Amino acid sequence: MKFAVIGNPISHSLSPVMHRANFNSLGLDDTYEALNIPIEDFHLIKEIISKKELDGFNITIPHKERIIPYLDYVDEQAINAGAVNTVLIKDGKWIGYNTDGIGYVKGLHSVYPDLENAYILILGAGGASKGIAYELAKFLKLKLTVANRTMARFESWNLNINQISLADAENYLAEFDIVINTTPAGMAGNNESIINLKHLSPNTLMSDIIYIPYKTPILEEAERKGNHIYNGLDMFVYQGAESFKIWTNKDADINSMKTAVLQQLKGE
């Protein structure tokens, strides 16, 4: 079977390394490549994918929303998130999924077993935040809180959550068991500070969905304060495993995928 990841730029993507490691571990001769498709060429997506004879593909920045009009069907999670990161091509039909939310939550559950009883704050209200929020809301016993700079961003949400400003979030930080940053602040080349951690409780798990850099400024600050931290590496690995399951109906080798990504990040 043939797979790929599409984006622009795409040369930095670790998806090929991760998926190939999984294929090798499972003894599969499947292939996975990175395809750079600029925005101005995206209208040719059907033609490009058809020529490659792909069975499925991942989509990353900046095409996660742009792909939707080209799909024959979009699953509920992707509709809720307003973004697609996985496409299955079956019987000529393109089916869109979003595995980011379930990928993050599966990873988080592995480091925070009592997740159901946690009081959680999500920073940011974009597509990534939405996907994670919908997944968490399925089983959390306490109402989820989401903070954003502008309240207008919540107009497209139809989830029963506490909506607060980032300024209010700073004041109430001590109340939360887990704080999750879903904004681009801290991504390589972006040193913007999203929130002041002055009131962060020492017992709070500070998380970020970014994994490059391995420790974002907000994670470094929380770690200096003595907090446990959790980056986005597991989310990346688990969302990839979920994509593989959608494409092949097989379980991925999580350990081989994570090891391959870690080796790449360490420059091995």
UniProtKB/Swiss-Prot annotation:
Single GO term (MF): shikimate 3-dehydrogenase (NADP+) activity
Catalytic activity: shikimate + NADP(+) = 3-dehydroshikimate + NADPH + H(+)
Enzyme class: oxidoreductase
Amino-acid positions noted as binding shikimate in the UniProt annotation, renumbered to this chain: S13, L14, S15, T60, N85, D100, Y211
Entries under InterPro entries matching the protein: Aminoacid_DH-like_N_sf (IPR046346), NAD(P)-bd_dom_sf (IPR036291), SDH_C (IPR041121), Shikimate_DH (IPR011342), Shikimate_DH-bd_N (IPR013708), Shikimate_DH_fam (IPR022893), Shikm_DH/Glu-tRNA_Rdtase (IPR006151)
Alphabetical keyword list: Amino-acid biosynthesis, Aromatic amino acid biosynthesis, NADP, Oxidoreductase
Enzyme Commission number(s) of this protein: 1.1.1.25
Transmembrane regions listed in the UniProt entry: none
Pathway(s) the chain acts in: Metabolic intermediate biosynthesis; chorismate biosynthesis; chorismate from D-erythrose 4-phosphate and phosphoenolpyruvate: step 4/7
Positions annotated to bind NADP(+): E76, G124, A125, G126, G127, A128, N148, R149, T150, M151, A152, R153, I209, G232
Gene Ontology BP term (one): aromatic amino acid family biosynthetic process
Active site location: K64
Coiled-coil portions: none
Gene Ontology cellular-component annotations: cytosol
HAMAP family: Shikimate_DH_AroE
Subunit note: Homodimer.
Biological function: Involved in the biosynthesis of the chorismate, which leads to the biosynthesis of aromatic amino acids. Catalyzes the reversible NADPH linked reduction of 3-dehydroshikimate (DHSA) to yield shikimate (SA).
PANTHER family: BIFUNCTIONAL 3-DEHYDROQUINATE DEHYDRATASE_SHIKIMATE DEHYDROGENASE, CHLOROPLASTIC, SHIKIMATE DEHYDROGENASE
Family: Belongs to the shikimate dehydrogenase family.
Name assigned to this protein: Shikimate dehydrogenase (NADP(+))
Species for this entry: Staphylococcus aureus (strain bovine RF122 / ET3-1)
